[in-house]
Amino acid sequence: MTASATGVVVAGHGVASGRAGDSPFAAGTIELQAPHFRARGLELSAYLLATVNVDLAPWRLVLRQPRWTFADVEWTRVHPPETFSFVECTVTRDGAAVDGLVYHPHPETKPMHHQPSTVVELLLPRLAALATGEELWLHLDPRQAALVT
């Protein structure tokens, strides 16, 4: 068990950002969900309204006491309400650190667009020229979550 690991940026489904052509959420899921999170006390305006997907293999995220957990978020009519947790994190890229959040839609309430168990979705400020294949170092608050193999 650890609270820090290196991972590789991987392509996501494009649904969170609204880039997926076949998505019913043209604005992007994060943009649609943000007002619901704000109403529950979490402001996302410091972050790009898209996720950075990082494969931490062989590590996978295990929630402990996330900073925020919101149950039964009714953000769309396309599917039933979802539960989301957010874990505070720091990401280091080329020696520069930025604060962000692990965005964790609970798989048991997420009807589609599942990620492999070793992939975490991050909400971060815009990182210039970030590309798939880049290595990032993820640091979690160990009280909120851990990484296990």
Give residue ranges: language-model regions:
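Anionic-ligand-binding alpha/beta catalytic cores of soluble enzymes and soluble regulatory domains
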Residues: T2-V78
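Glycine-rich active-site loops that engage anionic ligands at enzyme catalytic sites
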Residues: F70-A129
